[in-house]
Amino acid sequence: MAFDISVNASKTINALVYFSTQQDKLVIRNEVNDIHYTVEFDRDKVVDTFISYNRHNDSIEIRGVLPEETNIGRVVNTPVSMTYLYNKYSFKPILAEYIRHRNTISGNIYSALMTLDDLVIKQYGDIDLLFNEKLKVDSDSGLFDFVNFVKDMICCDSRIVVALSSLVSKHWELTNKKYRCMALAEHIADSIPISELSRLRYNLCKYLRGHTDSIEDEFDHFEDDDLSTCSAVTDRETDV
């Protein structure tokens, strides 16, 4: 399958290449002006591609040959419904979207996740001071330094990791480093263990149903396939 992609170099382009352990595929994800392009293929396939800049027409060009069974998708950003929260396979993309687009997203799920900021402020105090002075997130190694900072927390309290990641993503969007947001969102969402994702989803459901005043860190015999806790949609659970 031959392909040829040409994009105006003056447009905003975010690209991410990673190996998905869940799908056992190599994934190339691009975002151009709020449109997502995804290319997925098996890791043992030969892929012959190259990326170049054409100075004559000021465009970035991607050319190559992909296996016949390659999956190519194109999706325009769409609102997320509360029903996705009840599907364990959809929760990870919800978190990735929250981290990636913290400045522009809205809705009850995301508003609930924003309450986790209080945990971060309580633990670290001045967030700007943490990002600018301690972690230096705007430096050339800022993305890697941040990932190293939170990696040991991922298995302890995913609430802190999600909150910090969304806040640093918000910071990068404001400082013209938006290209880092997608890479961070994909990495964090894929690094949080299934048990921690289930714990966070369980407590988020409880909060959205009004059973708790905050998103707690409890996990009372909740099986990931058991959606009884998240079965009813109340007025508090409108579409995002």
From Swiss-Prot:
Gene that produces this protein: OPG176
InterPro entries in alphabetical order: Poxvirus_Bcl-2-like (IPR022819), Poxvirus_sf (IPR043018)
Protein's name according to its UniProt entry: Protein OPG176
Assembly and oligomerization: Tetramer. Interacts with host MYD88, TRF4, TICAM2 and MAL.
UniProt-listed Gene3D superfamilies: dsDNA poxvirus (1.10.437.20)
Family note: Belongs to the orthopoxvirus OPG176 family.
Function: BCL2-like protein which disrupts the host immune response by inhibiting the TLR4 signaling pathway leading to NF-kappa-B activation. Acts close to the plasma membrane and targets several host TIR-domain containing adapter proteins including MYD88, TIRAP, TRIF and TICAM2. In turn, blocks the host NF-kappa-B and TRIF-mediated IRF3 activation.
Keyword Cell inner membrane carried by entry: no
Signal peptide segment: none
Induction: Expressed in the early phase of the viral replicative cycle.
Keywords: Early protein, Host-virus interaction, Inhibition of host innate immune response by virus, Inhibition of host IRF3 by virus, Inhibition of host NF-kappa-B by virus, Inhibition of host RLR pathway by virus, Viral immunoevasion
GO BP term (any one): symbiont-mediated suppression of host NF-kappaB cascade
